[in-house]
Design a protein with these regions (language model features):
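Extended beta-strand/beta-hairpin segments
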Residues: 1-47, 55-132
């Protein structure tokens, strides 16, 4: 995974400006909670999982010279807190190749992060507001 720091800055209402190296985007919540100027944080998490899965499958198939013409991944949350990945593989693939690609799909770094034993450390920095 990337060693870049992801910086998030407060915007208008609940909107947040995200900077990742030279890339930028906005996260927000839908109306009426906020202005719906970008995907929600949960949707960004699903996007990370889907794109990581697709990249891992593509890289593996290409490395082995397999005839994978296209890979699409749709990811959604289930009400019970489960994440479901639907993977569409288009190509001239043997059943054993499909099985191997599905195994690879479950081993992408984001998938492993979400299903592993993860700890998050919060390091506070408190800056007092200037008094007027």
């Amino acid at each position: 995974m990337s060693g870049r720091t992801v910086s998030v800055r407060e915007g208008r209402r609940l909107a947040r400006t995200i900077a990742i190296g030279p890339h930028g985007m906005t996260a927000d919540e839908p109306e009426p909670i906020s202005a719906d100027t970008g995907p929600t944080p949960g949707e960004l998490l699903l996007a990370a999982l889907g794109s990581c899965t697709s990249m891992a499958v593509r890289a593996f198939a290409d490395r082995h010279g397999w005839q994978l013409h296209h890979v699409d991944v749709d990811v959604h949350f289930e009400p019970q807190g489960q994440i479901v990945k639907n993977i569409r593989l288009v190509g001239d693939l043997e059943p054993a190749q499909v099985e191997r690609l599905l195994t690879v799909a479950g081993r992408c770094p984001v998938h492993r992060l979400l299903t592993g034993d993860v700890s998050v450390t919060t390091v506070p920095t408190v800056v007092a507001a200037a008094r007027r």
